[in-house]
């Protein structure tokens, strides 16, 4: 319904059983990782992946990402909604996803129907990692939490995205990251 072609790997669709696996965590663009993301982008065509990611962008070129494309948002997130349509088209037989605790160890496995089990896992992510913001701050000091979350700017930008949501307009964000593997393009 979003104009993104449903092009899923035929090997997966022709298999006797399709079991989706992954780890559920906040996702910068899709709201949450895992679940339907095992289908799109997981086993979808390059064209489908690119078109799905374009749903994140504002209509006017150069104006960035739509404001509803944020971590934790599933209700108005077009990228997520499109991924759900692709997940339904794949008609997986089973899902096994894990939610890790703050030490990277399994807190809980969610298993069963690809959509229902995954949605239960997203609730646990909110419980473990969700932090209510009661007011915006003048200054936010944030850390990615160490390796591998701060290995490079590509990963570190996720911390920036969250920190900016907690600071007043015109406020200051101080990010603490090691950036051990910084090989991003200069413009990044």
State where each predicted segment sits.
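C-terminal catalytic subdomain
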Residues: 150-188
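Structural motif
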Residues: 19-21, 138-143, 174
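Conserved AWS/pre-SET-to-SET junction and N-terminal core of the SET lysine methyltransferase domain
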Residues: 122-124, 128, 135-158
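Conserved, well-structured core segments that form the ligand-binding/active-site neighborhood
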Residues: 4-136
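Short glycine-rich anion-binding loops that position phosphate/pyrophosphate groups of nucleotides
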Residues: 23-26, 145-147, 179
